[in-house]
Structure formats: C-alpha cells, structure tokens
Amino acid sequence: MRATTKEQGFYSQIFKLVLPIVIQNLLSAAVNSADVVMLNYVGQSAISAVSLASNYANILFMVYYGLGTGATLLCAQYFGKGNMRAIQTVEGIALRFSVIISVVVAGIAFTMPQMMMRLFTDNAELIRIGASYLRVMGVTYLCWGITEIYLAVLRSLGRVTISMAMNMMAFALNVFFNACFIFGLFGFPKLGATGVAIATAMSRVIELIGCVIVSIMSKDIKLDLRYMFIRNKLLFSDFVKLSLPALGNDLSWGVAFSMYSVILGHLGSDAVAANSLVVVVRNIGTVLCFGVASAGGILLGNVMGEGNLEKAKEYASKLLKLTVVTGAVGGLVVLGITPFVLKFASLNETAMHYLKYMLLINTYYIMGTAVNTTLIAGVFRAGGDTKFGLICDTIDMWCYAVPLGFIAAFVFKLPVLWVYFLLCTDEFVKWPWVLKRYKSGLWAKNITRDHLFEDEEKE
C-alpha cells in the first residue's frame, strides 16, 4: 500500500476507493432512510414522529463520525508509515469512547423516551409514537457504536469493500424486516413505527455479528474489545487532540442541524413530513460528494504519513476540482428524482407543496455541502487540522443559521418555504473562510510519531 501511493496516479487511486465508499454511504443512508420511506404506507403521523426521533440517530452518527475521524486520520497516516501496532491501539481508544457514549444514550432511550421526544414537539400523538420507536432503538445505538469504529479503521487502511459488504447486508435485512413488520408478512405482527425500530435493531445486531466474523478472518485488524484497555499516553494524547475538535465539530453541526427540525417541527406537521422525505432525497444526492471526501481523506492521509506533503497538496487540488463536478452531479440527481418523489409521496396538499420547493432548493444546496465537506472533513482532517472545522462550523451554525431560522420563523413569522430557504444558506456563508484556509496550505502535516512503544519495551 505504501508503494501504491507513490507509483499510481491520483485518479486511479481515488476511484478505487470512491466506488465502494459511495455504495457504502448510499446503503448507510438507505438503512436509516428506509424507516421513513416505508412508513409512508403507515401514515403521516408515523413519518413525522420517526423523522423527529431519528434526530438522535443523526446526532449519534455525528459522534461516531467524529470518533471515527480521529481513528481514521491517525490510522491512515500510520498505515502509510507501516505501524500496525499503533493502528490497533488507536482502534481501542476510539472504541473506549464510542462504547461509553452508546451505553449512556441507549440508557436514556430505554428509560426516558418521552422526554427525548418533547424536545422536538409538543404533539401528544407524535410523542407517543416516537417514544415507542426510541425505546427499541436503544439496542441499535449499542451495536452501532462498535461497528462504526471498526469499519472506519478498515476504511483507513483502504479495505473499503468490507464496509460496503456490511452495509449492503444491513440494508437488505432492514428493508426485509421493515416489510415484515409494516405489512405483516410471513406471520409477523403489524407494529407500525415500533416494528420499524425492531427491524432496524435486528439489522444492526446482525451487522455487528458480521463484523465479528470479518474480525476472526482478519490477520491483523481485529474487532477486539480488549484493545480498549491498551494504554499509550502519546497516542491517547494525539487521539484526543485530533478527535475532540472533530467530535465537537460534528456534534456542534449535528445539534445545530437538528435545530432546523425543531424550527420546522413548531411550524406544523406538514413541514415536518415534507422535510422527512427531503432528507432522504438529499442523502442520496450527497453520497457521491461524501464518498469523494472520504476517499480523498484516506488517500491524503496515506501520502502525508509517507512524508510527501507536496504531493498531498497536489492531490488536494485535484480533489477539489473533482468535488465541484460531483456537487453538480448531486444537484442533477435531486432534480431528476424530484418527479418520482412527488408521484410516490402520500402527503396532503400543503405538505406536497412544501416538498416540491424544498427539493428544488436542495438542487443547489448540495454544491455548498460538497465543497465544505471535502475541504473540512476530507482535506483538512487528513493532515490533522480539526480545530478549523470546529470554529468555522460553530460560528456559522450557532451565530448565523440557527438564530436566523428562529428569527425568520418566530419573530417575522415568514412562510415555511422562506424559513427553509434561509436555513439552506448556511453552507455558502462559510465558503470564503474555508477556501482561504485551503489555499494557505497550513493543513498539510505528517502527524505520526516514531518510537511510540519504546517505554513499554524497556519495562
């Protein structure tokens, strides 16, 4: 692999990584979106309740993504350096954090699901449906925290097909069990939103079992919880310094983005129902963009781990150009899917009106997301620059987008679509600062260390 980054060209390497990651991201989005799509056959209240409850899964995903980012950027560079022992240690550190967080959130979901729903809505029916859904989803959170870290480590080593296979399996099982619990197939009871939560939990449990099987067959990188107890002060310090800003960045952005749902949730169930389907379509439109960002981050990490910073800058330039293309493609995908979504959706007239124009707004919004994700989460993080994203996104979301949304909705009482349009300006506001940081080249660093385990060997 270390020779590969030196001998092969950028595009040949990036496309080998992109396709499996895109398929994985598409399936990962599909696993979470299948709940909302299939609940279309149950009713608008079920869609709205699950859409609001899913905000917790979205926030948790941001947490796991932040932890996985710290693991990925360290593991990618140490893989470029050829240090497998360091990779195992980093995996254990990431698992330690993810398991603790998963247990805490699952415990709250088991015991206080009504309280969790009241943060998003005061509608009694939505609270009842969402609470039942969340209580079962606690099982999903426990499994998810483990599998996301293990698959992130495998991706950082370029083993992206394994992650793709795991997500394909989870998606297929989720859709199958969803159908069983929604339509009562094969003798299963019709359980509506609760059945969808059970289906998701079952698919995640089986995905975890699949990861354990992969681990048993692997010669070097195992899914071994004993890794959590490996102690290395230098790597722990590096992981915390890199992961905490990334985790803070993703949490800050994720919670702020959930505030969009809070705003829309208080503008009526029609806005919530429309937005729940828009999120599904937007996730499909952005999978290629996120795939390029993830693949670029892995490739740049390997190159910088080898110490070739100039080549990393050259690759980053090509990656940005590729991102603009994928952003345009993503917008066209949303535009192309829109007629089918409008034909498929079973919403009332007002919600359908919102849905149509929200989808059109997202045809350009994806370009802003694509550029920022590639630079902040791909290029900058590959070189260990995680603090910039934290500062940039926190200011953008909490000082601009969220206050703007609340003022537009509750002070000026603008129409729903105007509120949504203003919320969707968040990505473009930060472009000047993100592009300035990219052009500075300050993100290009080799963050690996030599002689990590010398003190242990002396003892």
Show the residue positions of the predicted features.
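Short alpha-helical transmembrane segments in multi-pass integral membrane proteins
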Residues: 1-21, 75-140, 188-243, 300-366, ...
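N-terminal transmembrane alpha-helices
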Residues: 6-37, 41-42, 58-70, 74, ...
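Transmembrane helical elements of multi-pass membrane transporters/channels
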Residues: 16-35, 136, 147, 170, ...
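Helix-terminus/linker motif at the lipid-water interface of multi-pass membrane proteins
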Residues: 26, 30-48, 117-124, 180-191, ...
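Interfacial/gating helices of multi-pass transporter permease domains
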Residues: 39-58, 90, 124-129, 193-195, ...
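Small-residue-rich hydrophobic transmembrane alpha-helices
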Residues: 47-110, 144-163, 261, 274-338, ...
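Hydrophobic transmembrane alpha-helices of multi-pass small-molecule transporters
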Residues: 59-62, 174-178, 208-212, 284-287, ...
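Short runs within selected transmembrane alpha-helices of multi-pass transporters and secretion channels
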Residues: 68, 137-156, 163-171, 196-211, ...
